[in-house]
Amino acid sequence: MTVQGQKMSFTRSPEFRLLIIACAVFVFMSLLSPDRFLSGQNLTSMAFQFPEFAILALAMTITMMTGGIDLSVVGVANLSAVVAALILTQLAGPEMATGPSLIWLGFAVAAALCIGAAAGLVNGSLVAFFGLPPILATLGSGLVFTGLAIAMTGGSAVMGFPATVAWIGNESLLGVPVPLILFGLLALGLHLLLTKTAFGLRVTMYGANPLAALYAAVNINRVLLKVYVIAGMLASSAGLVIMSRANSAKADYGSSYLLLAVLIAVLGGVNPYGGYGRVIGVVLAVLSMQFLSSGLNMLQVSNFARELIWGVLLIFVMVINSNAIGRGFFARAKPTKSS
């Protein structure tokens, strides 16, 4: 393809439209309140805030690319954070700073990721082997994970972390917020996984046409298991970021992030019927939503009104994608009957 052809292809892509939307929202909010929105404090605050729900959106993205969904991501995030928090408070102690005690921090992170992988394995098994609809399977499992977190903490927050934990969520490395660095690494890793590996091709094939993937000798059950395990580990990573940001862990943190994660994935161009999705689109959608959320916060819009706006926006984006963009974009390929 020529350079001119590549430029034309990009300008017609969903990612280009998202870039325009992100820039438009940024400019609008800047004009609305330039002194507050463009202040260094606000821009830094946004860079610290959005990785929490952005990582959950990555988890939602890979499951939606298979035509499924993972409604348990917030429950997995909180359960993982609670387990890590209990390890840090019961075993490491608040005096941890350097030396051998850092081993407990690594152990807590590893334990949280294992919880996420185990939760993903449960979700993947329910979908792949028991044939449950992903929306129902993960809705039920999410309640179970939240219940486990409540049982482990009695419904109260776990606090008293070592200073290193707060540093991860609230400090910068070479001038870049640590949570933003973590999100960037995870987004890059997921992008490479979906675009540069055979596994990513299988995910796209299965999402576009499960029957064709089966005929192509794709091990569908293995693909689904891996997808939900990856989603679970991404959710655990988000839980660790939330824990370090709040310097505490609780079973009901981030309850508003579920709808936001779904909205970001759909706004980012991920086909909810499966078969298409790009991480760059999700990243641009994250930026758009963060700019909008920050603007609503400056306008002192209540959380309840904000939830209403997210819901209306989700429905609007779905309608636009299914009609204006064309039925073929969001229509799952249907196998034709042989004569």
How does the language model describe each region?
Residues F26-L31, S39-P94, S125-L132, V266-Y276, ...:
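Single transmembrane alpha-helix segments in multi-pass membrane proteins
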Residues A92-G142, L284-A285:
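Alpha-helical transmembrane segments within multi-pass membrane transporters and channels
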